[in-house]
Amino acid sequence: MVAVIIKGNEVAEKKRAQLTEEVVKLKEQGIVPGLAVILVGEDPASRSYVKGKEKGCEQVGIYSELIELPETITEERLLAEIDRLNGDDRINGILVQLPLPKHIEEKAIIERISPEKDVDGFHPISVGRMMTGQDTFLPCTPHGIVELVKETSLDISGKHVVVIGRSNIVGKPVGQLFLNENATVTYCHSKTQNMKELSKLADILIVAVGRPKMITADYIKEGAVVIDVGVNRLETGKLCGDVDFDNVLDVAGYITPVPKGVGPMTITMLLHNTVESAKRAGVVCK
């Protein structure tokens, strides 16, 4: 048995084509979705991520605005910029690129973004709504993961999902999203004593730990769906995931590659949230 490779880049392109059509229809009604991205400092990785978001906006027809601020900016000044964007009707989504400089409290910044424009899904109100199964902006990477699993046509309801990793960005929320889909969810983390045994029970295995090729075939139930969220750079310069892809390929039923797996879905779901926000706001641009 050789696993079917879930090509996240192809799924993302299909969804972006659908978003492009939606944006065209919105513009016919005078509604132009708008995303503001705040970049603080000159971190090369952050700048690269921001470029990807700008490119995605351009691709589907979303208006994007990049606000570049110096590393030395005060927290007060950054909060004032968010307040300005909260009140700007042209902007449906606000994203502050993380990480921020150490003198700025990320929690205060995230909580200042209006929940109606929280297209990253990080605001405590968004998280609370997600936890209780209410309509809200879902965090982009976890949402993208669920969409990739749905591409397999597997009925998630009743399946056992094992999540290895418990970060606030991926691990915790992705488990909650699968719980909302009526799956049975188990979390594993650095203190889990029988991780391999638990992992082998998974119909759907989500791995997000940041350790290159940690998960090998002996962690995998035959025929399982394996979603690899990790992105690690080896000494050779080559990218790899948290799953030993070649080793697991003959055991899993479905598997995502790294790169071109989960990554492309993250920005696509950000674009999706921005379009949804524009629909909800329904503000006609003049």
Swiss-Prot record:
Known EC number: 1.5.1.5, 3.5.4.9
Lineage top rank: taxon:
Bacteria
Q: Which UniProt keywords apply?
A: Amino-acid biosynthesis, Histidine biosynthesis, Hydrolase, Methionine biosynthesis, Multifunctional enzyme, NADP, One-carbon metabolism, Oxidoreductase, Purine biosynthesis
A GO CC term assigned to this protein in UniProt: cytosol
Q: What is the reaction catalyzed?
A: (6R)-5,10-methylene-5,6,7,8-tetrahydrofolate + NADP(+) = (6R)-5,10-methenyltetrahydrofolate + NADPH; (6R)-5,10-methenyltetrahydrofolate + H2O = (6R)-10-formyltetrahydrofolate + H(+)
GO function term, MF aspect, one = methenyltetrahydrofolate cyclohydrolase activity
Which positions does UniProt annotate for NADP(+) binding? Answer: 165-167, 190, 231
**PROSITE patterns for this protein:** THF_DHG_CYH_2
Looking at the keywords, is NADP present? yes
Pfam family membership, one: THF_DHG_CYH
For biological process, the GO terms are:
L-histidine biosynthetic process; methionine biosynthetic process; purine nucleotide biosynthetic process; tetrahydrofolate interconversion
What is the annotated role of this protein in its UniProt record? Catalyzes the oxidation of 5,10-methylenetetrahydrofolate to 5,10-methenyltetrahydrofolate and then the hydrolysis of 5,10-methenyltetrahydrofolate to 10-formyltetrahydrofolate.
Task: Describe its partners and assembly state.
Answer: Homodimer.
Give the protein family.
Belongs to the tetrahydrofolate dehydrogenase/cyclohydrolase family.
> PANTHER family recorded for this chain?
C-1-TETRAHYDROFOLATE SYNTHASE, CYTOPLASMIC (PTHR48099:SF5), C-1-TETRAHYDROFOLATE SYNTHASE, CYTOPLASMIC-RELATED (PTHR48099)
Question: What protein name applies here?
Answer: Bifunctional protein FolD
